[in-house]
Amino acid sequence: MAQLWGGRFTKETDQLVYKFNASISFDQRFYEQDIKGSMAHVTMLAQQGILTDAEKETIITGLQGILDDVKSGKLEITDKYEDIHSFVEANLIDRVGDAGKKLHTGRSRNDQVALDMKLYIRDEVQETDTLIKEMLEAILGIMENNLETYMPGFTHLQKAQPITLAHHMGAYFEMFKRDHERMKDIYARMNTCPLGSGALAGTTYPLDRAYTAKLLGFDGPTMNSMDGVSDRDYLIEYLSALSMIMMHLSRFSEDVIIWNSNEYKFVEIDDAYSTGSSIMPQKKNPDIAELVRGKTGRVYAALTGLLVTMKGIPLAYNKDMQEDKELPFDAIDTTKGCLQLFAGMLRTMTFKNDRMEESAKHGFTNATDAADYLVNHGVPFRDAHGIVGQLVLLCLDKKIPLDDLPLEEYKKISPVFEEDIYEAISLKTCVEKRNTTGAPGVKPMQEAVDSYKKYMEEY
């Protein structure tokens, strides 16, 4: 067992206690952040005259060697060590001798792990944002090519009004655009350096915390040492943002699953993103979309778990906070994997434009426009609503759409109707008349696409 403590103890740690307490099995993914943080720390110590330049160079050379050897696989991280910090320090001492024992001067594992976590999450926020960009690019590509691809819009999973595929995809662009903005917001707020906070009360050494923060790319040091070591707000915010991403992906998945069904046939998922059945030869299942929908719960669980962990912890650091890693790591890996797969599925998906347009022609998606026709001819909307409701009932009885109802039948219910009612309720007219900002008409949708393209150029 390699530990960084033990001088005041008279007994060896019980093996079960050691295993229960150890975190090396999961915090080893911090190895790069831990080493980079240590390099910045010793650089600052040398600048402040706490270490000599020779000691600094010796330690940094040793740390770089550990980093290179771990990356190449030459050096393995094992459960011989309690955590990633003890792994790095023990290996450093083995390589450079007594100079390595000075690495931890002016530092506690409390501010060290707080730094490691911030560096790691900062990297993950950027990686997540890159994957969000890929989603946005995939969605925008579909929008550009489908400004006049008509389809039904739904409320309560029932056909409601005609829209376009571009309009439907634009809703998801807006969702993931907000996810991108959340990533920027999280990064800006979390970008302060906790190193130098010590265990909770700083240190007596003349550290230059601003210099360390600058070396590591932070905007500055944290301004309260107790908060510096015990803050996990940024991680909770990140998990909340990941939960939002997964919620958006889950809703998108539900649409894809429905559209892919034989009852809808709006899309065909590429073979590379589908699976079959072990017993039913005809099956082509939307498993990626279903798994994304299913995995959303585990990301929510990570957020809820950390909130529950943190809610009762007094200041400052407590061992409970070791539980800020395993579930969040899983949530990060899950969300990134789902984003990557979903973008690939979208890019290779075939949209059945004719099928979508045919579906939009049925289900009385033009009923609102029939009511608007009456309003434009002086009928109060509430009366127009009732008149069209009667027309729908008549068409249901005759098993025909409004477009096929003879004019004399229209006139029996309201004499206001004339021959131009058919043009007014045509699919193209229904969509094109909706030309205000954010509506599905070609003009507002082209404006949206142009705006989104500019947004992506500045991403």
Q: What is each PLM-predicted segment?
A:
Residues 1-202, 207-213, 275-276, 287, ...:
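A helix-coil-helix interface module used to build multimeric assemblies
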Residues 2-37, 98-99, 280-459:
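Glycine-rich cofactor/substrate-binding loops
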Residues 38, 85, 89, 235-238, ...:
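Short runs of predominantly hydrophobic/aromatic residues within well-ordered alpha helices
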Residues 41, 62, 66-69, 91, ...:
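Generic, well-ordered alpha-helical scaffold segments in large soluble proteins
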Residues 43-51, 164-167, 236-244, 369-378:
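Short, well-ordered beta-strand elements within core beta-sheets of diverse protein domains
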Residues 50-51, 75, 264-265, 380, ...:
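Conserved hydrophobic residue
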Residues 54-55, 152, 222, 383, ...:
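A generic structural-conservation signal
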Residues 122, 129, 144, 152, ...:
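Charged, flexible cofactor/metal-binding loops and thiol motifs
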